[in-house]
A protein has these predicted regions:
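Multi-pass alpha-helical membrane architecture of UbiA-family
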Residues: 1-186
């Protein structure tokens, strides 16, 4: 039971705002493109898929962040008790958790069309490199915006896999939204 609690601490399940910040752009993309005259079943199913995907990928992202920041986290009062920084969970076990979470997310991803699957796979390096941006740029919030709002594009293409300027415009608007909330948070 202690190990399970440590896992829940590791994925920050008690702080679900990160999940919602990843999920909301997905729901916006789905809502923008969905043809509600055909009913709601696909829309609701895709909302569920994107919510589960956001939960799994945010969880994996938290673990990767903690692995990459473990030497810094131990020095900061707010983060020194995180499971990896404190030594309660090993890096190797944490990596196993990341593989499991990403595998489960992939099982959800393959429920979509080929373009959406491809977009999801392309997003992986960006999702896991955000913690490094805090070290190498003065604008990590901008990188976070590009990464966290990518689901809007994926959701649009999951319904209509052809190019349109509409999701791009909303995507850039969402990036500015992220710049705002993450600047306030930081």
């Amino acid at each position: 039971m202690k190990d399970f609690k440590l896992f829940l601490d590791l994925i920050r399940i008690k702080k679900p705002i990160g999940i919602m910040l990843l999920f909301w752009p997905c729901s916006w993309g789905l809502t923008l493109i969905n043809d509600f005259s055909n009913g709601y079943s696909q829309y609701i199913l895709y909302l569920i898929y994107f919510f589960l995907g956001a939960t799994l990928m945010r969880s994996a992202g938290c673990i990767v962040n903690d692995i990459l920041d473990r030497k810094y986290d131990i020095l900061v009062e707010r983060t020194k008790n995180r499971p990896i920084a404190s030594g309660d969970i090993s890096v190797s076990l944490s990596l196993l958790y990341v593989v499991i979470l990403c595998s489960l997310a992939f099982l959800i991803l393959i429920q979509f069309n080929f373009i959406t699957i491809l977009l999801g796979l392309v997003s992986m390096p960006f999702a896991f490199s955000y913690p490094l941006m805090k070290r190498y740029t003065y604008w990590p919030q901008l990188f976070l915006g590009f990464t966290f709002n990518y689901g809007l594009i994926m959701a649009w293409f999951s319904i209509k896999p052809e190019f349109s300027y509409i999701p791009i415009i909303f995507y850039f608007g969402a990036i500015f939204w992220t710049l705002g909330y993450d600047t306030i948070y930081g």
